[in-house]
Structures are given as structure tokens and as C-alpha cells.
């Protein structure tokens, strides 16, 4: 008997076939750099920086920016942001800089130039006759890069959220060490005229480069990161959610994964922790691999690890976390099953902690405490054999650990308990549910059962 086949009758004929579907329609690409060459882009001919500044500022005031000119200017302006490398900096085998080296954002990547002249029009008229200062260049760079952040804010954020962010960014870039170079609301007006900056590959590359530089190098103008910070771990919401989850429940990654009782986690965990990736290396190219063009389809997105993502946010919902209630359910990744496991794990980690004394008045008190704890442990280990203490723990409902939780799930036939459902309904019904969010899913799925 072939376990993969099914047998049925069609038009009086017995048919045997293997039902096969495409399980994963995407080919995920890992961001490892195989050729030991820094990430690279090609731009037009390097401009005269003073002329470029006046042209781009004029375009911003007129809400008519030329993306090619903007990218050419941002690359040329990197020379203004020199800093000192604090340690030897390597990533994927590439030496970026030695400790003590003077570096600019340009040191992290390779920017090639061709002979194509920029446009450099003065679309907003000629207002500035003198040459700009470094502070003015820094302010313009900061405002331009902030268009990336604004274009990444999704339509789910209602009201004046985006306008408020734009206003706060403008305030940053008119306060020392920056200087005011545009009128109020210019940034939002410019964004509205071209809202898709985050989809322009060269602009995205430059935003990621600036962010990678300022995240490591202490600099007078480090606040430029306010517009680029969204390039860090971009399209890695699955991995980022997992990292936040283990911090939230105070376990290591290894300890947390022991609670993932479902076969669909296997491929996702393997994908998330692919050997050779610098997922745990500070200041690696990995952190900005999407913006630097090192991967087409991220293996770390919420869709790539949808079961892990769903489970983590169901646990978050159980704990009443707004971020989880607002997150979007990955509908194709067993949300009903993940909500069951999420209920049990939520119960396991919510409202209970592991506590012990760690601080003492003096060394004598510390030694007395340690001696008393050793005695307690010895007594606990002296099992007289009359009770199978493991089984007793499983069925008492008080034991902690993967085995105890798994036993509780099995005892209840893989179904949620009434207390779990009440908790889910309580947290989701008190929340303004967004479409397709975890809050909406829990409300629709369990409100009639409570």
C-alpha cells in the first residue's frame, strides 16, 4: 500500500493516484554573499554637490523630485558623514573597515558611476545663490531619506498618523545640528506627489547603506536614521516576531522551539536558521539584506514562516498585546490549529513567573541561602518510589515545561479549554479589530463559544 496514494471509483473504473499540489510557490533566496564583493549599484555621473543640492531642494519645494537625481545626490553626499570605525568590521567574509579607520557610508558598499549626466533642473525656481553648508546638506539628506520611511507606512494606519510622523521628522531636521531648509508640511506634500520611494531599488539601496552606517558609527548627524531605520530587518517580520517572542517569555530560542508541537513548524524552523547566515551577527549585511538587494524573496518574512508567525501572535493575543491583536493573520498557515496551541502556551507563560532570590545583605546570608537551596534539592531528589512524580506533575496542571504542556493538550483532545476561549474572547472583544487581524479572527471564531 502506497501511503501517498488514494483509491476511488470513477465511471465504474477504480482509479489510484497521488494527489500532489505545489506546497510552496516561492523560491526563497538567502542573502549570503558568495563572491566576497561588497553590495553594488550603478548611478549616473557624479554631480557638483553645490549644484545638486540647489536642484534637489528646488525640486522638493515644488514637490517634483527626479529619483535618479536624488539617488545621485545622496551617493555623492556620503562624503560629508565621515566617522571612525570602533572595531574591525567584517560581514560574510568581507572586511568593511579596520578599527580606527576613517569611513563614510560609501565604505560599506560599491557605487559605480557611468557617464550619464543628471537632469539637475531648478523646478521650484532659483532661491539660493550661496553655496550650502554641511548642516544644510545633512538636513536635505535626512529629509530625502525620510521619504523611504513615509512610503513604508501602510494604509492600515488611519487618521493623521503619517502626517504626524512627517511633522515630527521635519522638526528633527530643523533643530541643531541640522538647520531649517524647507517650510512646514513640505515633506508630506513631496511624499504625496510620489508615494512609492521604497520600491525604487537604488533609493532603497542608499537608504539601507546610510542606516547600516549610522547604526554603528557615532556621528553628529546620526539622527538621519529616523528616516532609514525601517530598512533594518526589512521583510523579516517572521524572524523579528520570533526574537521578540523569546524575550517576552524569557527563554532561549532552543527552549522556546521545544514548545512548537506541530509538523508544519519543521520546514519553517529549518528555513529560519539556515546555516551560514549571519542572523545573530551585529552590524552584518544580513540586517539590511533586502534594501541592499542581496535577496529577492525573503526567507524570514511572515509569509515564509507563517505557522511560527501565527503561533507567536496568538500567544501575544492571549497576553493582551496590542501589536499581536493588530497583526495580520497568515490565513494559509493553519490559524485554527495555531490558535489552539497559542492558548495553551499563553496559559503557560501568562501570569506566572520563575522567581528566586538573587541579592543579599552580605556574603554570609548568600552562603546560608545557597546551603538551604541545596538541601531542598536533595530532599526533592530522594524519591521513595511510591509515586511516579512525573505523571503527578503532568496531571496536576501546575507543572511547567514542554512535556507538561503537551500532556495537557493531549488530555483535552487537542482542543481549547473553556478558560482559554474566555480569555481569547475577552482580549479581542475589547479591541477595535482591524480587517484580517488576529483580533478579528478570534472574535469571529470563538465569540459564539464563550
Curated annotation (Swiss-Prot):
Phenotype upon changing residue 257 to T: In strain: RC-HL
Reported modifications of this chain: Phosphorylated by host CK2. Unphosphorylated protein N seems to have a better affinity for leader viral promoter encapsidation. Phosphorylation of protein N in ribonucleocapsid may stabilize the interaction with protein P, thereby playing an important role in viral transcription/replication.
Family: Belongs to the lyssavirus nucleocapsid protein family.
Note: Displays a superantigen activity in human and mouse, activating mostly V-beta-8 subtypes of T-cell receptor.
Major location (coarse): virion
Record bears the keyword Transcription: no
Protein name listed in UniProt: Nucleoprotein
Protein's UniProt keywords contain RNA-binding: yes
GO MF term set: RNA binding
Subunit structure, as described in the record: Homomultimerizes to form the nucleocapsid. Binds to viral genomic RNA. In nucleocapsid, binds protein P and thereby positions the polymerase on the template. Protein P acts as a chaperone on free protein N to prevent it from aggregation before encapsidating genomic RNA.
Protein purpose: Encapsidates the genome in a ratio of one protein N per nine ribonucleotides, protecting it from nucleases. If expressed without protein P it binds non-specifically RNA and therefore can bind it's own mRNA. Interaction with protein P abolishes any non-specific RNA binding, and prevents phosphorylation. The soluble N-P complex encapsidates specifically the genomic RNA, with protein N protecting the genome like a pearl necklace. The encapsidated genomic RNA is termed the nucleocapsid (NC) and serves as template for viral transcription and replication.
